[in-house]
C-alpha cells in the first residue's frame, strides 16, 4: 500500500469527512456543500497531506448561504464521485443520502451546492 493510500484510508476510517456549522439564528434553511474532485491537485502524498490533514480543507466554506441556519460540508477524499461515500460508516451514496435526510428533516428549505463529483451526489440528493 502506498503512503497516499494509507493516508486516505486513515482519513476515511477515522474522520467523518463532514463538518456541520450553525449560524445561531433560527431559520428554516439548511445548506449542503459538496466538494468537487478539485479538493486537492495534483494527486500526490504531499498535496493530499496539506489539503486534507493540515488544512482540513472543505470546499465552499467562503461561500456560505447567508440565509441558512445549518451548514453541512462534505468531502470525498478518494475523489471517486462519492461512490465510496464520505467515510467508513457512510460508505456509499445511498448511505450518505439517508444520513442527510435525517440531518435536514427539521428544515423547510434545502440548498445544495456541488460541482464535478459534488454534482453527482447533488443529483442523487435531488432524486430523494
Feature map (PLM): residue ranges:
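Alpha/beta-hydrolase fold nucleophile elbow
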Residues: 105-115
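Catalytic phosphate/metal-binding cores of nucleic-acid and nucleotide-processing enzymes, i.e., regions
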Residues: 98-102, 111, 128
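Glycine-rich nucleophile elbow surrounding the catalytic serine of serine-hydrolase chemistry
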Residues: 114-126
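Hydrophobic/aromatic beta-strand patches that form the interior of the parallel beta-sheet core
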Residues: 30-32, 70-75, 111
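Cap/lid segment of the alpha/beta-hydrolase catalytic domain
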Residues: 66-88
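Alpha/beta-hydrolase active-site loop
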Residues: 83-104
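Catalytic micro-motifs at enzyme active sites that drive phosphoryl/nucleotidyl and oxygen chemistry
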Residues: 60-62, 99-100, 121-124
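Short, surface-exposed "cap/lid" segments of acyl-processing enzymes
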Residues: 3-68, 80
Amino acid at each position: 500500500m502506498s503512503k497516499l493510500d494509507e493516508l486516505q484510508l486513515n482519513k476515511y476510517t477515522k474522520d467523518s469527512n463532514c463538518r456541520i456549522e450553525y449560524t445561531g439564528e433560527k431559520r428554516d434553511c439548511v445548506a449542503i456543500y459538496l466538494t468537487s474532485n478539485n479538493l486537492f491537485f495534483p494527486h500526490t502524498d504531499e498535496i493530499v497531506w496539506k489539503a486534507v490533514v493540515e488544512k482540513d480543507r472543505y470546499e465552499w466554506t467562503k461561500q456560505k448561504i447567508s440565509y441558512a441556519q445549518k451548514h453541512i460540508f462534505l468531502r470525498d477524499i478518494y475523489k471517486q464521485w462519492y461512490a465510496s461515500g464520505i467515510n467508513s460508516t457512510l460508505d456509499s451514496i445511498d448511505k450518505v443520502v439517508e444520513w442527510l435526510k435525517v440531518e435536514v428533516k427539521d428544515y423547510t428549505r434545502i440548498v445544495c451546492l456541488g460541482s464535478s463529483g459534488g454534482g453527482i451526489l447533488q443529483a442523487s440528493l435531488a432524486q430523494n
